Amino acid sequence: MSVKIHYQNTHFITSAPDIRHLPADEGIEIAFAGRSNAGKSSALNRLTNQKNLAKTSKTPGRTQLINLFKVTEGCHIVDLPGYGFAQVPLEMKNKWQKSLGEYLQKRECLKGLVVLMDIRHPMKDLDQQMIFWAIESRIPVQVLLTKADKLKSGARKAELLKVRKLAETFGGDVQVDVYSSLKGLGVDQLRAKLDTWFAPALAHLQEDEEGSNSAE
């Protein structure tokens, strides 16, 4: 019997300034990354059907910590600090970028990266840097073109094709899809993608349950 993931049960565990302050490097983590105005918090809230799981802020760049959420046993979502906000001091920007790079390159339990980009301003330099880091670490990437409702259907498809073509040049496992927190566009596909990334942890969970049942 397969284990179904109920994303609405996702809850906050802890915040950390860098990789050294995170809990033990075990289980499976899926990280969400994006520019400060990419709609990351709204996307996480829509994914989990919770209004305030990830705090949305009127001031981009407020999220300076790595935030860890538990989805189910052995499965976690990591909300990485938003990047690329112009009004943040350079020293802080550099610190964030170092933390992001360190996390993507050294965290063993990281098994997937979701990079969110405003569909009207995709593939900025830092977005591409995040993807490069993930590919170097052999981590699959799901690019979400957010705020897709802001474009009409034709323009949306054209932008999607353009970004998919660019994504092919990275090599590695990079998928690109559209997403709208407002309209719910792409939410089911995102859940399905996370299901596949979390599957090994769930398989272990099932084995443990079956083992304990047979022991009884």
Curated annotation (Swiss-Prot):
One Pfam entry name: MMR_HSR1
InterPro entries reported for this sequence: G_ENGB_dom (IPR030393), GTP-bd (IPR006073), GTP-bd_ribosome_bio_YsxC (IPR019987), P-loop_NTPase (IPR027417)
Keyword Transmembrane: no
Gene Ontology terms for molecular function: GTP binding; metal ion binding
Keywords (A to Z) from UniProt: Cell cycle, Cell division, GTP-binding, Magnesium, Metal-binding, Nucleotide-binding, Septation
Record: residues binding Mg(2+): 41, 63
Annotated binding of GTP, by residue: 34-41, 61-65, 79-82, 146-149, 179-181
Cofactor dependency: Mg(2+)
Record GO biological process: division septum assembly
SUPFAM superfamilies reported for this sequence: P-loop containing nucleoside triphosphate hydrolases (SSF52540)
EngB-type G domain ranges (all copies): 26-200
The keyword Nucleotide-binding is assigned to this record: yes
Cellular compartments per GO CC: cytosol
Residue spans crossing the bilayer: none
Purpose: Necessary for normal cell division and for the maintenance of normal septation.
Family the UniProt entry places it in: Belongs to the TRAFAC class TrmE-Era-EngA-EngB-Septin-like GTPase superfamily. EngB GTPase family.
Entry protein name: Probable GTP-binding protein EngB
Origin organism lineage: Bacteria, Pseudomonadati, Pseudomonadota, Gammaproteobacteria, Vibrionales
Gene designation: engB
